Design a protein with these regions (language model features):
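Solvent-exposed interaction patches of small proteins and small membrane subunits
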Residues: 1-116
Length: 116
């Protein structure tokens, strides 16, 4: 089976879509409900993992062009979610989505408009 090549613009669009999903879920979920509801936690964690996995596969050219994105940090988050899920701090995850994802989304939307 041939490997499909996904371009940076498509990856960034996918990141934005999953960020929007996370923000929507977090904004409609109190922290206590987030902690208590395993389905919501898993859904949000998967969407965050998709965002971070997509970031890993962005080309170095794009990463070097847009250094305002913390590309390496997203790889670290992805590794924790994928390989050390028990070490995931739910409060940090919740607050990261609530506080940092809107800013990340805005930056990615700007990049999306600038790349071909």
């Amino acid at each position: 089976m041939a490997k499909t090549i996904i371009d940076d613009k498509s990856r960034i669009e996918n990141m934005i879509t999953n960020i929007e999903y996370c923000i929507g879920k977090i904004n409609s979920t109190e922290y206590a409900d987030f902690v208590d509801n395993i389905d919501v936690r898993y859904a949000i964690s998967m969407a965050v993992q998709i965002v971070c996995e997509s970031a890993i596969h962005i080309t170095n050219d794009t990463k070097n062009r847009f250094k305002e994105i913390e590309w390496k940090e997203m790889q670290t988050i992805r590794n924790i979610i994928s390989h050390e899920y028990g070490a995931l701090n739910l409060e940090i995850l919740y607050n990261t989505i609530k506080d940092d994802f809107p800013v990340l989304k805005a930056k990615l939307e700007m990049i999306y408009e600038k790349i071909g």
